[in-house]
């Protein structure tokens, strides 16, 4: 009998199964305390001040691009080689994606190609740390400063990656991560936004859940029901406690798993 290799088979152990079972038995499986704990732990791991857990990296990118509130038709430079969601998120935010070629050796966006694509309408840059290899941040940060661009990092491939002493996802205004089933840290589906800008995090968290001022955990916890308002026209991009339960256990193993791959 031939051995069948499953696509994207994640490394799930008894710890994850036990954590999910405990969550299900708790009676609270939606967005709640485990999501908050996962956000805090991931921010600490990444050495970022703030984190917002969401339903996917696509959701993270869309929320980040939506948050920067550019004018319709403004241009956002993006690498020519990336997954479709990087570009789709730009389009869904009302902006125009401008493709810049990648370096043939690193497969990351080429800083020289970025400068060639800059126009009067260019307002932001989305980079992708492809296959876990960090982009040339020294050159990219010079370009960002020179042209006053907003930088967003697509870190779907680079949970463990660092450039110098800084983790990928902490250089720009936002860092967007994926916990899809094929990634090094999985929650089945899921993502995370990192940011060091406190004033940006609250609105993003609200927009990720319909624009509501309080999520269900805050409305129905042991302190009793509390009124909520719809602050913004938001989306349905929140993470659940079941996903966070898996993520918390996966995060504990990430350094050990990295050593095995090395």
Where are these regions (language model features)?
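N-terminal "arm"/small-domain region of PLP-dependent enzymes with the aminotransferase-like
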Residues: 1-29, 33, 229-231
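Generic structural signal for small/hydrophobic residues in well-ordered secondary structure
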Residues: 20, 42, 60, 76, ...
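Phosphate-binding glycine-rich loop
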Residues: 28-75, 89-93, 99-101, 166
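Structural detector of well-ordered beta-strand residues that form the stable sheet scaffold
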Residues: 52, 77, 98, 150-152, ...
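Conserved coil-to-alpha-helix start sites within the AMP-binding
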Residues: 82-87
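Hydrophobic/aromatic ligand-binding patch that stacks against planar heteroaromatic rings
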Residues: 88-90, 143, 242
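Active-site phosphate-binding strand-loop segment of PLP-dependent enzymes
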Residues: 105-187, 192-200
């Amino acid at each position: 009998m031939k051995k069948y290799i499953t696509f994207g088979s994640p490394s799930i152990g008894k710890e994850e199964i036990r954590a999910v079972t405990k969550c299900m038995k708790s009676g609270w499986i939606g967005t709640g305390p485990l999501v908050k704990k996962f956000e805090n732990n991931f921010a600490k791991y990444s050495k970022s001040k703030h984190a917002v857990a969401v339903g996917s990296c696509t959701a993270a990118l869309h929320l980040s691009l939506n948050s920067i509130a550019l004018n319709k038709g403004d241009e956002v430079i993006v690498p020519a080689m990336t997954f479709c969601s990087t570009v789709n998120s730009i389009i869904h935010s009302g902006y125009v994606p401008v493709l810049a070629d990648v370096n043939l050796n690193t497969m990351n966006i080429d800083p020289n190609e970025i400068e060639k694509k800059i126009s009067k309408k260019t307002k932001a840059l989305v980079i992708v740390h492809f296959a876990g290899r960090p982009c040339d941040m020294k050159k990219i940060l010079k370009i960002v400063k020179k042209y006053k661009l907003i930088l967003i990092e697509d870190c779907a491939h680079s949970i463990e990656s660092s450039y110098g002493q800084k983790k990928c996802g902490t250089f720009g205004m936002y860092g967007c991560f994926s916990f899809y089933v094929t990634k090094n840290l999985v929650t089945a589906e899921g993502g995370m936004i990192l940011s060091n800008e406190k004033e940006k995090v609250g609105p993003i968290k609200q927009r990720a859940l319909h624009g509501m001022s309080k999520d269900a955990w805050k409305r129905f916890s042991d302190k009793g029901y509390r009124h909520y308002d719809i602050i913004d026209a938001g989306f349905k991009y929140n993470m659940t406690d079941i996903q966070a339960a898996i993520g918390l256990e996966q995060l504990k193993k990430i350094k050990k798993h990295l050593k095995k791959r090395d």
